[in-house]
Amino acid sequence: MCYFNSINLNIGEVIKISKKEKKIDRQIKSNVTSGFEFMQWPIIKEDPNSADLLLEMAHWEFIPSWIHNNKELETSREKFTTLNAKGENLLESKMYRDASLKRRCIVLSSGFYEWRHYKPIGAKKENAYPYFITIKDKPVFFMAGIYQPWTDKNTGETIDSFAIVTSAANTLMSKVHNKKKRMPTILSESLAHEWIQDELNESRIKEIANFQLDDEDMEVNSIRKDFKISAYPQEKFIYAELPSLDQSEGFSNELPFV
């Protein structure tokens, strides 16, 4: 699942989706953000009052309508997480159906993080190796999202909350995120445009929500295990004991006995 993300938007940069665009008027930068920090994150929506796109900083964590205040929200976090929403279940889910039909958005990203599990030869247990994943020639790319306006009944404050839509992993991501074999639903510009249109039928919503980006469009690199506190979290790091992704998990550099 996608729980760690990065973003790098510079002032003056233009986000384009089809014929619509949004010029960035402030720097938005985070090398590593954990969804479990429940921070604000940039999303793109259709602007009903303009021909351009609407960029908004929204709360990363889909908050269902039956949660009434912050105390209930904190209690719910002990039972389930709503940082991600499975594309296969969007329209069957009581929590996500209405948003999937009426409130779809684009979550902006410059790269995300996942863990590959591997048991080195001679080790007693599997180790988790972090990877940083980007899209070739796309400094900023588009993840499918759904959003939910939520009002804290105690304070009266209203915010937009959102979840990143995920799909079954493609071949490459199945090797990286090899436990759960999931990935964020990453959309081309044309699919991103379609995703945020009002008139999508249920069949098309399901198709786009479960879209798998081609392996060839992605770049993946192993990084240091302490990347979350590193000054250079996205820097490539090679583990001597870890076979490359195009080798079998049981690969050994040792010569066989003859």
List the predicted regions and their residue ranges.
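Short linear sequence motif anchored by a di-proline
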Residues: M1-V258
